[in-house]
Amino acid sequence: NYDKPPVEKPPVYKPPVEKPPVYKP
């Protein structure tokens, strides 16, 4: 028996961003 259906794509890891990345050269 299958516990869960086969995943089409792997889960995308997105870290929670508090603020947008600041570009500082």
From Swiss-Prot:
UniProtKB keywords: Cell wall, Hydroxylation, Repeat, Secreted
Cell location: Secreted, Cell wall
Residues the record lists as 4-hydroxyproline modifications: P6, P11, P16, P21
Entry keyword Secreted: yes
Region (Disordered): 1-25
Gene Ontology annotations for the cellular component aspect, listed alphabetically: extracellular region
UniProt-annotated stretches for the region 4 X 5 AA tandem repeats of P-P-V-[EY]-K: 5-24
Extent of the Sequence repeats: 5-9, 10-14, 15-19, 20-24
Keyword Secreted attached: yes
Residue stretches of biased makeup (Pro residues): 8-25
Family designation: Belongs to the plant proline-rich protein superfamily. ENOD12 family.
Protein name, per record: Repetitive proline-rich cell wall protein
Source organism: Phaseolus vulgaris (Kidney bean)
